[in-house]
Amino acid sequence: MQKKYYELFFIVEERYKNLFLDFAFDLGIEAIEEKDNGVYIRSHESLEELSWALEIFAQKLTTTFNLNHKIISNLSLVEKENKDWIQEYKKGIKPILVDNVYIHTTWQEEKKNFINIKINPALAFGSGHHESTYSCVKFLQKFSKSKLRALDLGCGSGILGIIMAKFGCNVEICDTDELAIDSSLENARLNGVDFHKAWCGSIDKANGLYNLIVANIIADVILILEKDIKNHLEDNAILILSGILDKYSTRIKEKFQDLELIDEMQINEWCSFVYKNNKKG
């Protein structure tokens, strides 16, 4: 065991915390702990570049949300004597309960009488804590049915695809990041489910029509893919759109007004919409 390790600490506004956690995971950081109203990141490698990247990320979010104050503070990087910080990190990750779905890590116990979703957060994609993922999990429990042909568009860690598979859907997944596909396939293996098809790319590579499509991606990408998404919807299909900041919700609704909006949810500034393909002509 190395004698020293690096510890990066910062405080971030609660409503933006998950964005920073996902950002760090996407950069391959595995040891992250939430504690004392702040976030600790630990590594044997120098974290100077990550510290700089977090500051740049915070500046971009400040611009995106039109804020007039900093959303990250007390950013500090120190060198410390080594300890078993991997175990400390594991203690900091909390499982998630969304109605009948229980999302937990590979080292946490399953919950009896619930649909258990096991996720390895070390695979560098989301572990289900983000508001938009939470909304999708709630909606999928309502609209996932056995033998539906389903697509997880922009699958990330594969959580949503795994949930649909647990409900008996014939699931396909896609993502523009090959690492996301690998992560999803590994998490599917951990959960004892299979995806009927998986590819690196977007919905333009899909064949045929779907009864259920979930797209937990940012609004700009949804707007770009609007026509492709609609062209792959079966009659009366369900479309779940999530990952949408509230300031973009009007634009999304305008683009999808030819479909029937049957449900919606907003948690903090994150919006999710459920449409049914009853086209208005």
From Swiss-Prot:
One GO CC term, this protein: cytoplasm
Main location, first listed in the record: cytoplasm
Xref: CDD domains: AdoMet_MTases
Entries under InterPro entries matching the protein: Ribosomal_L11_MeTrfase_PrmA, Ribosomal_PrmA_MeTrfase, SAM-dependent_MTases_sf
GO terms assigned for molecular function: protein-lysine N-methyltransferase activity
Function: Methylates ribosomal protein L11.
Reaction it catalyzes: L-lysyl-[protein] + 3 S-adenosyl-L-methionine = N(6),N(6),N(6)-trimethyl-L-lysyl-[protein] + 3 S-adenosyl-L-homocysteine + 3 H(+)
Subcellular location as annotated: Cytoplasm
Binding site for S-adenosyl-L-methionine: T133, G154, D175, N216
Pfam families: PrmA
Protein name per its UniProtKB record: Ribosomal protein L11 methyltransferase
Top-level enzyme category: transferase
Catalytic activity, EC: 2.1.1.-
Biological processes annotated in GO: methylation
Family stated for the protein in its record: Belongs to the methyltransferase superfamily. PrmA family.
Keywords for the protein's UniProt record, in alphabetical order: Cytoplasm, Methyltransferase, S-adenosyl-L-methionine, Transferase
